[in-house]
Amino acid sequence: MNCPYCSHPDSKVIDSRDVDDGVRRRRECVVCGQRFTTYERFQPAGLFVVKKDQRREEFNKEKLLSGLRRACEKRPLPAGAVDKVAGDIEAELYNMGKAEIPSTLLGDMVMERLKMLDNIAYVRFASVYREFTDITQLKKVVDNLVNGQDEGIYKGQLSLLPEDKAVPKTRYQRR
């Protein structure tokens, strides 16, 4: 690792710590004595997304997160839910062991998870992903969602009934 201050190629590691997705190392240059931090992360083999027009684009988790955040914007979702969905999708893609995946597979994976997470986010994403040309196509998706809904409320959805009518409250004893 070259020193960022004097560009000398040698440095010694003073401290190493595990961080979320790699190793953080504190280093000291053997020539100028300046200290700096480096991060080492595992970088999996390249994964490419094959677009509808057959272009190939390297998989970008940030682009996936951006689309998810746009669909989930201003929705009452638990903190970290969108990041977890993106992480789960990324892990599943890499676990497939393929070098290329079609963009339709990626889109379907997002749709599947958004449908479980939040109906409004699902419809928002579907309206862009499915490229609706008129309101009747959107209405059909919403009708299918309403008619096919098993539980009435998906995780992350707000109840229409006040909480005291939906579930009887119980008193808890203080410890």
Curated annotation (Swiss-Prot):
Binds 1 zinc ion. A zinc finger (unnamed) spans 3-32. GO terms for biological process: negative regulation of DNA-templated transcription. Its cofactor is Zn(2+). One of its GO terms (molecular function) is ATP binding. Keywords: ATP-binding, DNA-binding, Metal-binding, Nucleotide-binding, Repressor, Transcription, Transcription regulation, Zinc, Zinc-finger. Coiled coil: none annotated. Residues 47-137 form the ATP-cone domain. InterPro entries: ATP-cone_dom, NrdR-like_N, RNR_NrdR-like. Pfam families: ATP-cone (PF03477), Zn_ribbon_NrdR (PF22811). The keyword Nucleotide-binding applies. Belongs to the NrdR family. HAMAP family: NrdR (MF_00440). PANTHER family: TRANSCRIPTIONAL REPRESSOR NRDR. Negatively regulates transcription of bacterial ribonucleotide reductase nrd genes and operons by binding to NrdR-boxes. This is Transcriptional repressor NrdR. It comes from Dehalococcoides mccartyi (strain CBDB1). The lineage of its organism: Bacteria, Bacillati, Chloroflexota, Dehalococcoidia, Dehalococcoidales. The gene is nrdR.
